[in-house]
Amino acid sequence: MGVKLNICLLLLLVAIISSQGFNLRKKEDSKDEKPFGNYRRGSPCSNYEGSCTPNHIPCPPGSHECRQLPGCYPGVERCCCQY
């Protein structure tokens, strides 16, 4: 009986360790590396309540392009400021 208990405990331990390793390999989709319209802290664009928007997407309603404000990735994004 002692041998069966040891085998059961060993199998339980292996199952727990295996499931923990599987959880570590899951990709977290909630974190986006470069979200649209994110605010660059401390940049002139964000200081004037602007947001960096990709060049191929128009500025959101109620905002306009602020060419004079840097702070977004050049050639990829532009600053869209509130009116």
Curated annotation (Swiss-Prot):
Endpoints of the signal sequence: 1-21
A single MF term (Gene Ontology): toxin activity
Region of interest: Disordered: 25-44
Subcellular location(s) of the protein: Secreted; Nematocyst
PTM characteristics: Contains 4 disulfide bonds.
Similarity comment: Belongs to the Cnidaria small cysteine-rich protein (SCRiP) family. alpha subfamily.
Protein name as annotated: Small cysteine-rich protein 3
Species, as recorded: Acropora millepora
